[in-house]
Design a protein with these regions (language model features):
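Conserved NTP-donor binding/palm subdomain of two-metal-ion nucleotidyltransferases/polymerases, i.e.
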Residues: 1-35, 41-267
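ATP-dependent small-molecule kinase phosphotransfer cores
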Residues: 304-395
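A glycine- and Lys/Arg-enriched "phosphate-lid" helix/loop adjacent to the NTP-binding pocket
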Residues: 375-451
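Short beta-strand-centered segment that lines the nucleotide-binding/catalytic pocket of NTP-utilizing
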Residues: 293-309
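NTP-dependent small-molecule kinase module
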Residues: 215-218, 222-240, 422, 428-482
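P-loop (Walker A) phosphate-binding loop of NTP-binding proteins
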Residues: 274
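Conserved lysine of the Walker
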Residues: 279
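Hydrophobic positions on the alpha1 helix immediately C-terminal to the Walker A/P-loop
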Residues: 282
Length: 482
């Protein structure tokens, strides 16, 4: 992608000391926005790296509090030509450890950066160093029950590798690029308190694909015992965090938050358009695009399918039939009176539900999430006889002023979103896509949306174009908003 090529060329030109330090087997995928790019940056080059991030419009994002570690930051970038996102997992400290708990800091950053090599123009960790780090990472992350389960599966299918497919592929990839003598020298130069012979034996078994579950368990125990001096937190703190994570991953417990959020506050985005403008499809695709790394929620403000609305509609249908066939003017009048109030109750219920959704959206945005809404109720459409997703009782002001005022006051509490994207198109184009609606109502909705003018909050989007062009334009505008 253009952004990767230009960004890393800039870092190289400005002599920023960095390298891609793990999973180089998937480097190409990372450079194309398919997976993370794990970068190690020299502490003394942090300012230069930060300047480069700003120059190329990378945006800081935050992991959930339980997944934040000192010297580790996250950024996302945007490739304008493809509209793909890339994720930089930036390390100033080499922090690693168990699954969900990076409790160790290996202070070997200087060595990794001094011995880096280049793949084309991309600096990467030396293969022998990467293999050593991969062995440590894999065995720290391996749980005893996972090793036992894998061994059980191996009994059923002997050809099965001793690790999961992804891990095995990475280890085999690195072994093929590793010289045993250089690997031994790396062990000696780093001087980590681990057994050189044990690691050399492991390398030989790995190259011959003869690793057993016993080998994995023994090496795992050895790594944890020998690297205890590299723990970055106290044993008590470490045990407390581990117990908390174990508890929260039990069945029926509230799931731990995994998605990243914006640093200060999130955004509420509204897609507004008449029927046939592609709102629902755009909401789905934008949610898929952003939720790769960010916490994204979609909120539908349309009329909900609920027991209340179903009951009201059934009651009014029955009352309508009764009003048509029962004799007596007074009876008919009373039935119309009842229908009017049950209908009003339904619209007030819908208004209260929309207000609750607005408050929920604000709460989500305040915690850094992005909220994408469909059929957002806007006061901008209040001049319509039947405002789109807005108050419906104005015409009943003579009969039930209290209900009208209650509905109006409810909608008045719903503020504007951070950005309204008005999906504007000619009526004939929308009619081709959606021709099963009342034509006059459809025309009024199209005219109302097309009447929206650009402002600080409103961004008109021309949808008289191929869908992919519309989607790319929306992605570019949303990126500017983040």
């Amino acid at each position: 992608m253009d952004i990767c090529r230009e960004f890393f060329t800039y870092l190289n030109t400005n002599q920023v000391r960095y390298c891609h330090w793990k999973s180089t087997i998937r480097l190409s995928e990372g450079l194309n926005g398919k997976t993370d790019l794990d970068l190690l940056i020299h502490q003394n080059d942090k300012q230069s790296f930060d300047e480069a991030l700003g120059k190329f419009d990378f945006k800081r994002i935050l992991s959930p509090k339980w997944k934040r570690y000192p010297g580790v930051e996250d950024y996302i970038g945007f490739d304008r030509s493809t509209t793909a996102l890339i994720h930089l997992h930036v390390h100033y400290n080499l922090v690693l450890g168990e699954k969900h708990l990076k409790g160790h800091h290996l202070r070997i950053e200087e060595y990794i950066l001094k011995t880096r090599v280049f793949v084309d123009t991309m600096p990467v960790v030396q293969p022998e160093v990467e293999l050593l780090l991969a062995i440590i990472r894999v065995h720290m992350k391996s749980e005893v029950y996972e090793i036992a389960l894998n061994q059980l599966k191996k009994y059923l299918r002997p050809a099965r590798p001793p690790y999961t497919t992804g891990i095995w592929e990475e280890l085999v990839f690195l072994v093929k690029k590793t010289s045993p003598e250089i690997f031994r020298n790396v062990l000696r130069e780093l001087n980590l308190p681990v057994s050189e012979q044990l690691f050399m034996d492991y390398l030989e078994k790995l190259s011959q694909s003869t690793i057993s579950s016993h080998d994995i368990l023994y090496l795992r125990q050895h790594i944890f015992e020998r690297l205890r001096p590299f723990k970055r937190i106290s044993p008590v703190h470490y045990s407390a965090i581990k117990a908390f994570i174990k508890l929260r991953t039990l069945p029926l417990m509230p799931a731990l938050k995994n998605k990243k959020v914006l640093p200060e506050t999130g955004r509420i985005i509204a897609l507004v358009g008449a029927d046939g403008s592609g709102k629902s499809t755009l909401v789905r695709d934008l949610q898929s695009w952003l939720s790769w790394k960010l916490s994204v929620r979609t909120v539908y403000f349309g009329i909900p399918e609920s027991m209340v609305t179903s009951c009201v509609q059934t009651v009014n249908r029955v009352l309508g039939i009764a009003e048509k066939y029962l004799p007596g003017k007074q009876v008919k009048k009373n039935l119309r009176y009842i229908m009017r109030y049950t209908d009003a109750g339904q619209w007030i219920f819908i208004a209260r539900g929309r207000l609750a959704l607005f408050k929920k959206s604000r709460k989500l945005a305040s915690s850094g999430s992005i909220v994408i809404t469909d059929r957002y109720p806007l006061a901008l459409f209040k001049s319509m006889d039947h405002p789109m997703d807005g108050p419906r009782l104005q015409s009943q002001a003579i009969y039930m002023p209290f209900a009208v005022n209650l509905e109006k006051s409810t909608y008045d509490q719903i503020g504007l979103p951070d950005r309204i994207f008005a999906l504007q198109a000619d009526f004939p184009a929308l009619r081709k896509r959606k021709d099963n609606l009342d034509e006059q109502q459809h025309i009024k909705k199209v005219e109302a949306v097309n009447a929206l003018k650009p402002s600080e909050c409103i961004m008109p989007i021309n949808v008289n174009r191929p869908y992919e062009d519309v989607l790319k334009d929306l992605k570019r505008e949303i990126w500017r908003l983040l």
